[in-house]
Amino acid sequence: MDDKKQFSRRLLAIGALFSLVLAAYFVTLFDAQIVHGAEYRARSIRANTKSETVVTSRGILTDRNGKALVTNRSVYTLELDTSLAPSDDAALNKELLRLIELLENRGIVWEDTLPLTAGAPFAYDFSVSGSHTALNSYLVSKKWADEDALTTDTDPPLSPEALLSRLRTEFKVDGELTDAEARKLVGLRYCLAVTKLNQLSTAAIASDISVELIAELKDGAYAPIHIGTSSVREYQTDAAAHILGRVTKIPRERWNEYKEKGYAMNAYVGYDGVELAFEDYLRGRNGRRIVETNTAGKVTGEIYSVEPEPGNTVALTLDIDFQEDVERILAETVESMTAEDDIDRGAAAAVVQVGTGEVLSLASYPTFSLKTFNEDYTENNTDPLQPFWNRATQGTYAPGSTFKPVTAIAALETGIITPKSTILTKGVYHYGDWAYKCWLYNQNGGTHGRIDVTEAIKVSCNYFFYDIGRRTGISTIARYASAFGLGEPTGIEIPEKIGVMTTPDYVNSLDGHYWTDGQTLTAAIGQSYSLFTPLQLANYVATLAGGGTRYNAHLLKEVRTYDSAELVDVYDKPPAEIIDIEPENLQAVLQGMRDLVVSGSVAYYFKDCVVDAAAKTGTAQTGGKVSNGVFVAFAPYDDPQIALAVVIEKGGSGGALASTAVQILNAYFTSVDEAKAVVGENMLIQ
């Protein structure tokens, strides 16, 4: 009995002790989860999470029909991660030296943000955008320089050698390393330090790395390395290189501008072409995410604090299939001419939609491919024909006789002549002490006889336009040229030259030049000092064909969200100018251009044109043995849809330009298989 009582007391004691332990456990659990739960959870998150920038996708570019021109391709990036870097300098240096050896053995060039040259004699190199600002900030943070004494226009007070020496000491670099070896190591250490200084977690040092390299870097084999993802631009066409443009890291000279807009120092932006022009549309908005990791450092979950927003889809006015045709036609023409006379030459073509100003094609020869830009850079950059030069918008050329319709409109609209007025042309026009000759007189001593303005345009009679040009006056001719957009900005969103219309003020502003009244005569036929771009010529003809309504030339058609679900913006600017032209005056000029292709000097080339067209030839004197060839046209004649201009440097007055124009018209109005035109002998035309 006593044993039973003793057992009961023991059991009761054990039960009481167990209850006490259980109660203590629940009190502790209540305190941890309820009373201090939020606090402990926050501590846990801080200890096992990190914040990362989520780089979003740049918007894509399409043509007018929705055909992709520039897209994005996802790639793996090699990043230095400040959170994975060992705190011990020796350990970190050892890991980075192993990484350098691996990258060099694999032939991988990594991005080095330290603005010092790679080898002795060391010098500062601030060619990378933001590098000067970043170094100044770092020097101030280390108290190696006074902030007030630093600018982005001058080198820091430390010499390059002194900076390298201080960095070796700061990062505890092994003294046995050569300066060249140390330079590589401190470059990566500096990158980590600046990344941390800017309160960022990672910095990409190589892009588009291979899966094989990733396999070697996995499982923390190289402590500070993180494999990230980003996107690179993928070009779906070899055409339109001058128009599309490239993306690069922010140019040094524009860093302050982009900084104010919230760009990161390592952001990629449009460098030229529409990539630059439409940067605000194409730019996405990066996101932020909180990444949870386990004790081994592996990601176990993620929470987005700011969702990334991809850039918009920008539709251009270009028809890329047509653009490819125009570039091919232009190249074939030039290469055929060069094969015959062994003269190297450039060329350009511009095609504009009548009634809208939409640019359907801008072609420049020679050109280049954005797909192989880096591989071909040295060859293209040293090519004397300058493939990177966009002749269609930045090449300026004397218009030659393609300017004569402007002179005709100016004379008609001011009452100097009427559509029925005739002039007896005599081959040589005497003005003061000068004698100005018609091209026909120079050729065989002939004249065009008595003609009206329509016939004068058809046969391109210089004598006729000398006379009406003198009577109309240079100020009136220049005023109408400006109204047609010649010597004025076209409105195009990419860089262009404005060109110049001959005027007394302009000529007198040139050193060693002065105005003479005789220059009115040469300006009236498109010579003298007048210089215009192919795009200006095409848009002028579009204005003429459209009855005098001039629209700004433009490449933007519309902007939609990345998935094209919503319309963001659309080009809808009103006409830039409306020229009041009497219908009978307009008809007299347009009929002359039509007669040229029906029964004039280019009729041979237009007999296989699939559409009724009108045109004007031009020969632009350059002072050399061979003049530039200029040709403008529009079609269809009765309901104009497109206008074009073709310029071939040293192209002379041959029929190659007319043939080129016919091929371009056929390419637009028919399928590619039908886009053929007669290629005859290089007949003399004016």
Task: List the predicted regions and their residue ranges.
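Beta-lactam-recognizing serine transpeptidase/beta-lactamase-like catalytic domain environment
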Residues: 70, 76, 293-305, 318, ...
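Conserved, well-ordered alpha-helix/loop/beta-strand core segments that scaffold catalytic motifs
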Residues: 299-347
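Solvent-exposed, polar/charged alpha-helical surfaces in well-ordered, non-transmembrane soluble domains
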Residues: 90-101, 211, 215, 219, ...
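Conserved helix-loop functional segments at active or binding sites
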Residues: 332-339, 365, 595, 670
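Membrane-proximal periplasmic segments of bacterial cell-envelope enzymes
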Residues: 1-280, 286-307, 340, 347-348
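A generic structural motif
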Residues: 83-84, 648-652
